[in-house]
Amino acid sequence: MKKCIWILGAILACTCMNASAQKSNDEPKGKAIVQVFSNFHTGFGHDNDERGFELDRSYVGYQYDLGKGFQIKGVMDIGQSDDVNDCHRIAYIKNAQITWKTGNWTLNGGLISTTQFNTQEKFWGYRYVMKSFQDLYKFGNSADLGISAAYKFNDWLSADAIVVNGEGYKKIQKKDGLQYGLGATLTPFEGLTMRAYYGLTEGADKTQENIQNLATFIGLKLDWFSLGGEYNRMWNAKHTDGLDYNGFSIYGNAALSKQVDVYLRYDDCSDDKQAFIAGVQWKVGKYVKLSPNFRWNHDDAYGGYQDSYMGYISCYFGF
């Protein structure tokens, strides 16, 4: 299977190089990708000592349209790592991919964005404030090495498939298991989106169970209002038999003006975790967003009851 992935990737790359060498009416064009997530936060009560400025994450890259439906993109992810102290930053290559759009098909190869929760993250819309549910609670990875394909049947139905290493973009492939995923998206009318996704991650050997993921989502987005909900389930987490998680997330926003909107979100994860966030977003010009927000988190996964209350001023800069 790995050989097939690399062969398909090589064919796609060669095709792209050949297409870019040919004369075309499509003029190549590119754009820089820069996104910076930062915040100031302070705790209340027993978290009163937790305060400070934080550079949460930075994305730097470039996207180039070659013409004939081909596009290449490379993105670096600069953020914190669990393997080093908080005062350190570490850089990863998050995307190094080639995309080909032809007819109703979209094909991706390389270090690509995954499809497990991409729709939910875009609908949530405040990634610089908080990760989407599956990303936050480690139900899956946002990018991985492999290939994906999507086909649009008509205006209201599309489907996609993906095959990747299954270990994310921060780890190299050290094991033999792969991850497979199938998804379908329905848009019965403008503004309403429904999606279902199923994924399976193989165990490295007979001692490890296959991980299974089910992700469902429904969301309504209007010009001034949006409301979405998702339910997610994971069987055999960490390749451990019987270690199952599930949970849901509900979120919405309302526009007060072209520059200001308010948002709410509630998460409930079966791993004894709940979270609530409420905030206001202010668009300061074209490239900057500011969002004062309040967060409540509850976590008694270790048998100890504990609530935390935090105030944030989240900041986004990007183009």
Regions from the PLM with identified roles:
Residues 23-166, 176-178, 185-192:
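Outer membrane beta-barrel
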Residues 184-186, 282-284, 307-319:
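Outer-membrane beta-barrel "beta-signal"
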